[in-house]
Amino acid sequence: MIKSALLVLEDGTQFHGRAIGATGSAVGEVVFNTSMTGYQEILTDPSYSRQIVTLTYPHIGNVGTNDADEESSQVHAQGLVIRDLPLIASNFRNTEDLSSYLKRHNIVAIADIDTRKLTRLLREKGAQNGCIIAGDNPDAALALEKARAFPGLNGMDLAKEVTTAEAYSWTQGSWTLTGGLPEAKKEDELPFHVVAYDFGAKRNILRMLVDRGCRLTIVPAQTSAEDVLKMNPDGIFLSNGPGDPAPCDYAITAIQKFLETDIPVFGICLGHQLLALASGAKTVKMKFGHHGGNHPVKDVEKNVVMITAQNHGFAVDEATLPANLRVTHKSLFDGTLQGIHRTDKPAFSFQGHPEASPGPHDAAPLFDHFIELIEQYRKTAK
């Protein structure tokens, strides 16, 4: 039985469609993502916590879903908005169609709306708070009330909400289409011990570090610097994550203590912003953020262009960079800062997602640079 669904934005704009997920309501910041596929990775990316994701590609759900494509243990997106859900999910890896997957994870979703109109609105007015109501006779007035009651992501610390409850080890590398998920690697195959802060870490980041010889200890977002230093790490990784970086004072304090040592530090996405804040820079909320797998970024030091995956609604304000931070990468879409490197410490970060999943791997060599810094540190400090 087809059920109705309604999306209402805080400005009062209404989109009527049909429900393809759970019955109920979802409230969050409405953003758009331009990736053509990879919807399951997007839904399970913790960076989308408290956000309703609009996918601009018209056909979503063609290849179904499977366990291997999940970037975390649950769906973190607050809701999903698409143009069209195909009648058939066809792929040799498919184990469950998208609609069933959404219902099983209790995710409210709407289809059959004009996503081009919605995307234009978000580009012109900026990301807006919104509410999806799915079920019989959805109440537009109630949806508007809920959308306007949502406080927004400014000032919202979500890293401590999505982080792991306890520390754990990770030694699994990348999987292949033919071989599936690999067995965990043995410790003697992983010469580098890296402590990774989980601010909302994606699994493919962890896999790419393991591929390069890292034995990972994943720690909760609020783990103190003292506890991490007792683990005697060869490197410290700062993961991606949702929300506003500025309220994460616990992480900023820890990073500042790491920067008093010579241990290499590598940050991605939220981790990039936290490294900048710990170094004295400031961050700002973007109009509608960067969300997609086709964003051109210039490596200003090598004078080359990379096509990258992006997912962030905050950015580091380049005008506030202290003297000990140099710019390494910039967005060719809007000129915003994409990468920094400390001039006095082996610490650097990237705003985009070099692990992709979904997206291109042009920025993957950033992981190799982290390993180079670790090898130099081990030679001089140990």
From Swiss-Prot:
Active site (UniProt): C269, H353, E355
The EC number(s) this enzyme carries: 6.3.5.5
Record-level GO BP terms: 'de novo' pyrimidine nucleobase biosynthetic process; 'de novo' UMP biosynthetic process; glutamine metabolic process; L-arginine biosynthetic process; pyrimidine nucleobase biosynthetic process
UniProt xrefs under PROSITE patterns: GATASE_TYPE_1 (PS51273)
Gene3D superfamilies on file: 3.40.50.880, Carbamoyl-phosphate synthase small subunit, N-terminal domain
Leader sequence residues: none
Keyword tRNA-binding among record annotations: no
Catalysed reaction, written as an equation: hydrogencarbonate + L-glutamine + 2 ATP + H2O = carbamoyl phosphate + L-glutamate + 2 ADP + phosphate + 2 H(+)
Protein keywords: Amino-acid biosynthesis, Arginine biosynthesis, ATP-binding, Glutamine amidotransferase, Ligase, Nucleotide-binding, Pyrimidine biosynthesis
Residues reported to bind L-glutamine: S47, G241, G243, L270, Q273, N311, G313, F314
A Pfam family reported for this protein in Swiss-Prot or TrEMBL: CPSase_sm_chain
HAMAP family the UniProt entry points to: CPSase_S_chain
Function noted in UniProt: Small subunit of the glutamine-dependent carbamoyl phosphate synthetase (CPSase). CPSase catalyzes the formation of carbamoyl phosphate from the ammonia moiety of glutamine, carbonate, and phosphate donated by ATP, constituting the first step of 2 biosynthetic pathways, one leading to arginine and/or urea and the other to pyrimidine nucleotides. The small subunit (glutamine amidotransferase) binds and cleaves glutamine to supply the large subunit with the substrate ammonia.
Family as reported in the entry's similarity comment: Belongs to the CarA family.
Protein name from the UniProt record: Carbamoyl phosphate synthase small chain
Originating species: Escherichia coli (strain K12)
Taxonomic lineage from the root: Bacteria, Pseudomonadati, Pseudomonadota, Gammaproteobacteria, Enterobacterales
Gene name linked to the record: carA
